[in-house]
């Protein structure tokens, strides 16, 4: 699982706002948050960059922790 939703809520932004910042639709963010879709490395980097641009200070490992 990932921490997109938790970090996004801490920033006080909606899925739509995060998606708009990246240039995507809100359902795509929802699918990543719920685990319906698994992001590629490039997509994960875009999400982390957007979260940081919106006020977070997170790394890719913070947002997408390694799981065995």
Regions found by a protein language model. Name each.
Residues 58-68:
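Short amphipathic recognition helices of helix-turn-helix/homeodomain-type DNA-binding modules
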Residues 42-60:
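DNA major-groove recognition helix of helix-turn-helix/homeodomain DNA-binding modules
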Residues 1-10, 17, 21, 58:
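A short, Lys/Arg-rich alpha-helix, primarily the initiator
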Residues 24-39:
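Recognition helix of helix-turn-helix/homeodomain-like DNA-binding domains
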Residues 5, 19, 30-31, 45-48, ...:
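Key DNA-contacting residues within the recognition helix of helix-turn-helix
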């Amino acid at each position: 699982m990932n921490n997109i939703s938790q970090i996004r809520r801490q920033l006080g932004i909606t899925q739509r706002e995060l998606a708009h910042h990246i240039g995507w639709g809100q359902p795509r963010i929802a699918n990543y948050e719920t685990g319906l879709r698994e992001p590629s490395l490039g997509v994960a980097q875009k999400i982390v960059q957007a979260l940081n641009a919106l006020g977070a200070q997170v790394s890719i490992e913070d947002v997408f922790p390694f799981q065995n």
